[in-house]
């Protein structure tokens, strides 16, 4: 299949996944459903077998960050997939920065205080500088006060607000907030003139201007 062209620009079609394994893709899988997909991004809390399954049937990279329920990744990481935690992965010129995990609300892995997440962000400084910023921020949790929840486990990270304001990525992609948690649930919306936000709950496809 030829890549899509809009107004003279090549577009990269990206499949985003998070939180719930899609029956459409897993239980009722047909290889044709992945046709035209150029990249797969997982925002966390998905079974490793699910990601491995999709990786085995697609010929594109499957990038992922950890959700707060992904402790099993330490023992059984998704086969054929690429962990981009605390990294910037460049694919076809698109710079994708990964920071998984949720706010700390109990004992366990992949949970962080605001201070701990800020420390992780600070450690990314050299990589951000080397890559001259990033185009997509891929996380599990949302930013503070932007599509997050009122309860402690679903609060967003303040450090993500800083990243959006300072580096102005084209897309901020997260999970963690399920469709049932919000009356006015939106999967894609504009944060400002620079950045669109996508909640990748279950599955979502968007097109990124290819460079």
PLM region descriptions:
Residues 25-31, 49-52, 82-84, 122-126, ...:
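A generic local structural motif
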Residues 16-24, 66-155:
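Conserved catalytic scaffold of divalent metal-dependent phosphoesterases
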Residues 57-58, 78-79, 193:
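Short, structured coil segments at secondary-structure junctions
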Residues 2-57, 127-133:
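N-terminal active-site segment of His-dependent metallophosphoesterases
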Residues 17, 26, 88-92, 163-167, ...:
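Binuclear metal-dependent phosphoesterase catalytic core
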Residues 21-25, 46-52, 68-74, 104-108, ...:
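Active-site environment of divalent metal-dependent phosphoester hydrolases
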Residues 16-18, 39-45, 63-68, 84, ...:
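Active-site neighborhood of phospho(di)ester-bond hydrolases with catalytic His/Asp-centered motifs
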Residues 58-68, 157-160:
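A short, gly/pro- and small-residue-rich
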């Amino acid at each position: 299949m030829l890549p899509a062209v809009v107004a003279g620009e090549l577009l990269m079609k990206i499949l985003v996944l998070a939180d719930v394994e899609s029956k459409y893709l897993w239980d009722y899988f047909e290889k044709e459903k992945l046709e035209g997909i150029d990249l797969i991004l997982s925002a966390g809390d998905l079974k490793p077998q699910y990601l491995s399954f999709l990786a085995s049937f697609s010929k594109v990279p499957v990038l992922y960050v950890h959700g707060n329920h992904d402790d099993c990744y330490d023992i059984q990481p998704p086969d054929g997939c690429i962990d981009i935690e605390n990294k910037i992965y460049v694919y076809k010129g698109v710079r994708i920065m990964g920071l998984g995990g949720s706010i700390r609300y109990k004992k366990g892995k992949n949970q962080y205080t605001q201070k701990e997440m800020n420390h992780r962000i600070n450690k990314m400084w050299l990589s951000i500088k080397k890559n001259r910023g990033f185009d997509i921020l891929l996380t599990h949790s949302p930013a503070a006060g932007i599509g997050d929840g009122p309860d402690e486990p679903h609060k967003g990270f303040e450090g993500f607000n800083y990243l959006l304001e300072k580096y102005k990525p084209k897309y901020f992609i997260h999970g963690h907030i399920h469709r049932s948690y919000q009356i006015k649930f939106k999967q894609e919306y504009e944060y400002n003139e620079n950045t669109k936000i996508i909640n990748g709950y279950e599955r979502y496809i968007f097109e990124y201007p290819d460079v």
